[in-house]
Design a protein with these regions (language model features):
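Structural microenvironment flanking redox-active thiols in thiol-disulfide oxidoreductases
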Residues: 65-105, 116-124
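Thiol-/selenol-based redox modules, centered on thioredoxin-like
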Residues: 136-163
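Short active-site neighborhood of thiol/selenol oxidoreductases, capturing the structured segment around
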Residues: 42-64, 70
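N-proximal helix/coil linker or "cap" segments that precede and/or mark the start of modular domains
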Residues: 1-34, 44-49, 75, 96, ...
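Active-site acidic short loop of glycosyltransferases
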Residues: 47-49, 79, 107, 128
Length: 163
């Protein structure tokens, strides 16, 4: 039997970047990605605020199921020096689906994507192995929490954000 496929897979897995140290406590890696109009938006432009960097995609069922929870948290905490930056891992031919999902799920905060799917520059920067995934960045650009979902999102925001 031909084991070239297995051999190739082993090589790919060996070359896959290993997650660096835990992101929490680190300075959030800087990135700039285009918004739907093509305007470049950088993470550092949110300095001075707490920002939830939310990695998702229109084709991701678990992301879409989590979106109402994120919308609720945004409504509850946006007045406490908090915002969200949505980073979509949609593909080039998926821009329309991305825009429809933003409208349908009522994601009213800033959205960006290079439409490069898993080839997006942010994937290795943040060691993203699956979505939905997020990091909470403090006003100085430091990651203070990650992978906040469900009740844990609101609970953590309530603890961390200024009253």
């Amino acid at each position: 039997p031909d084991h070239k496929g297995i051999e190739a897979l082993n090589i790919l897995l060996a070359e896959k970047p290993k997650p660096a140290q835990d992101l929490v406590g680190q300075t959030a890696p800087e990135f700039s990605l285009p918004d739907p109009t093509g305007k470049m938006i950088s993470l550092s432009s949110f300095r001075g605020k707490y920002v939830l960097v939310d990695f998702w995609a229109s084709w991701c069922g678990p992301c879409r199921l989590e979106n109402p929870n994120v919308v609720k948290a945004y409504a509850q905490f946006k007045h406490r020096n908090f915002t969200i930056l949505g980073v979509s891992l949609d593909q080039e031919d998926g821009k329309e689906n991305w825009m429809k999902a933003v409208m349908k799920d009522k994601l009213t905060w800033t959205q960006v994507s290079d439409l490069k799917f898993w080839g997006s520059a942010v994937v290795p920067l943040y060691n993203i192995e699956g979505i939905p995934f997020n990091v909470l960045v403090d006003p100085n650009g430091k990651i203070v929490a990650k992978a906040l979902r469900g009740e844990n999102l609101a609970t953590t925001l309530d603890k961390v954000l200024p009253k």
